[in-house]
């Protein structure tokens, strides 16, 4: 079983092969997702909401992400493992380096940061020092209070152009992957077409190179607000591994996300 790397994902993009990602927080679920063929696993700061019961992701700490990264690492053999850098853990380049090192030493293959042009120096610094970076644009949940809630981004021409420009700048700075969240599908397609690095969408239409969802949404065990872009695969399959396979198959076939999961 060949390990997934950023080079693998670039090859998928070049070949037009859609890939899938899920969040994971422990060895058992991560192992199941890995063995069924999920390509990318994210130890997300979404744990603040789905594991810890907070209303947003802001309370999550580097130590908590590192702990769960170690757990997931022990359970997987194939998938690329990304660790989220939580709120205010990368406010300065120096702080970014210290905390990213902690997460890489915990077993991550890559770290993910939310934000645009203000991150360019940190992205370049990490890349130059051997720490791969996944960037994240659009709805960046750590900025929920700036946005005034979990709202679709990039609907007007100026903001759409800004997001596209930031995507190009982050790639130029060295980012190896990009997540785009809750942006109009045409904008996501424009970004995907403009970049050579793979683009992973969540609530961004079907034209991105890959898709990511929160595992609790895929398994229908999220409490409270259920995002429009999510889909409960356990409901239609009745078994966890079958749910994961259905998600992988629907992404590969271009069935998911459908129009009901997409913003325009």
Swiss-Prot record:
Record-listed E.C. numbers: 2.1.2.11
Keywords: Cytoplasm, Magnesium, Metal-binding, Pantothenate biosynthesis, Transferase
Cofactor note: Binds 1 Mg(2+) ion per subunit.
Cofactor(s) named in the record: Mg(2+)
Subcellular location(s) of the protein: Cytoplasm
InterPro entries per the UniProt record, alphabetical: Pantoate_hydroxy_MeTrfase, Pyrv/PenolPyrv_kinase-like_dom, Pyrv_kinase-like_dom_sf
GO cellular component, one term: cytoplasm
Functional description taken from the UniProt entry: Catalyzes the reversible reaction in which hydroxymethyl group from 5,10-methylenetetrahydrofolate is transferred onto alpha-ketoisovalerate to form ketopantoate.
Entries under HAMAP family matching the protein: PanB
Record PANTHER family: 3-METHYL-2-OXOBUTANOATE HYDROXYMETHYLTRANSFERASE
Quaternary structure annotation from Swiss-Prot or TrEMBL: Homodecamer; pentamer of dimers.
Assigned protein family: Belongs to the PanB family.
Protein name according to UniProt: 3-methyl-2-oxobutanoate hydroxymethyltransferase
GN (gene name): panB
């Amino acid at each position: 079983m060949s390990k997934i790397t950023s080079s693998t994902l670039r090859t998928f993009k070049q070949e037009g092969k859609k890939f899938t990602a899920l969040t994971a927080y422990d060895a058992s679920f991560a192992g199941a997702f890995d063995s069924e063929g999920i390509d990318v696993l994210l130890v997300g700061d979404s744990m603040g909401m789905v594991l810890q019961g907070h209303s947003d992701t802001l309370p999550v700490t580097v130590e908590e992400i590192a702990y769960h990264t170690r757990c997931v690492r022990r359970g997987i053999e194939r998938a690329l493992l990304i660790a989220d850098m939580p709120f205010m853990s990368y406010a300065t380049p120096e702080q970014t380096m210290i905390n990213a090192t902690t997460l890489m030493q915990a077993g991550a293959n890559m770290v993910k940061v939310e934000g645009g042009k203000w991150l360019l120096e940190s992205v370049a610094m990490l890349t130059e020092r051997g720490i791969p970076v996944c960037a994240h644009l659009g709805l960046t949940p750590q900025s929920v209070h700036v946005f005034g809630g979990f709202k679709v981004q990039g609907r007007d021409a100026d903001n759409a152009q800004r997001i596209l420009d930031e995507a190009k700048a982050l790639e130029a700075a060295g980012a190896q992957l990009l997540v785009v969240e809750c942006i109009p599908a045409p904008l996501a397609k424009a970004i995907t077409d403009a970049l050579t690095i793979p683009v992973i969408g969540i609530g961004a239409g079907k034209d991105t190179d890959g898709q990511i969802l929160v595992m609790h949404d895929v398994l229908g065990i999220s409490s409270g607000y259920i995002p429009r872009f999510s889909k409960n695969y356990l409901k239609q399959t009745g078994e966890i591994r079958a749910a994961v396979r259905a998600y992988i198959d629907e992404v590969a076939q271009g069935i998911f996300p459908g129009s009901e999961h997409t913003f325009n």
